[in-house]
Amino acid sequence: MNTLIFTGQVAIVTGAGQGIGFEIAKQLANQGAGIILNDIDQSLARQAAEVIRENGGECIAFAGDSSDPEVINGMVDEAVKCFGKLTMAVANAGITLFGDFFEYPVENLRKVLEVNLAGSFLLTQAAAKQMRQQKSGGRILLMSSVVGHQAHQFLGAYAMTKAGLEMLAKNLVLELSPYGITINSVAPGATLTERTLTEDPAYPKTWSAITPMGRPAICEDIANAALFLLSPFSGHITGQSLVVDGGWTSVSPLPDLSNMEVK
C-alpha cells in the first residue's frame, strides 16, 4: 500500500490503548489518517496517542467507556471539531469473560453484551449518521472473532456477541449502502496481545501447536486485514467477515483447557 493512502481520512478507533486496536490506530496514522483514539483506561489512551504523535501521526486521546452513548457522541463531535469530518470508525473495544455456562453470572452476561454488542452498535449508528450527513461515504469496521464461527469452550456469551456483530454488518448493508458507507468485520483467531500473554503464558505454545500456519497471529496480522477493509481497495466489499486465523477454522482443533479455572 502507498504509505499515505489514508491522507485526508479521519478514524475513530475504540479499545485502542494497546493490542489490536492500537496497531490499527498506529498503522492508519502512519498512512496519513487523523485518529481519535479511545480506551476506557485514560492512562493507556494517553500513552498510545503520544506514541503515535511521536512517530509523526495525528492522534487525539479520548478516554471513556465506548458503550456509553455520551462517550460515543463525544468522540464523533471531537473528530468533526478537530479534523473537520469523520470517514472511518473501528469498533474494536471488547471483553471476553470466560465462564462455565451453567454458572455464568448474569452480571458478566450483561457486561459482555453491553460492551461487545451495544457499544459496537451505538458507535456504528453515531458514525453512520455523521457520514450520511457529510454525503461522502465512509468505512465502518467491526471486530468479530473466529469463535463467532466455531464453537469454543467457556465462551458462549462472547461467541454470541461476535456472531451478532457479523449479522449486524450484513443487515446494515441494506441501510448504509445507499450512502456509500461500507460495513465489514474482521474475525481474528488466536492473537498474541498483552492481554492474552498475561492471562496465559503458555498461549503461544498452545496455539502454535494447533494452528496450521504454525503460530498464532500477531497484532500486525489483524491490523493489515483491517486496513484493507478500510482502504479504497475494498470499495465494493460490504457485509463481509474476513477471517485471519492462520487456517485454524479450516481444521478447528480445540486447545486443552482441562486445567483452566473458570468462574
Tell where the protein language model's regions lie, with residue ranges.
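Active-site helix of classical SDR
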Residues: 124, 161, 169
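Residue(s) in the substrate-gating loop at a strand-loop-helix junction
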Residues: 145
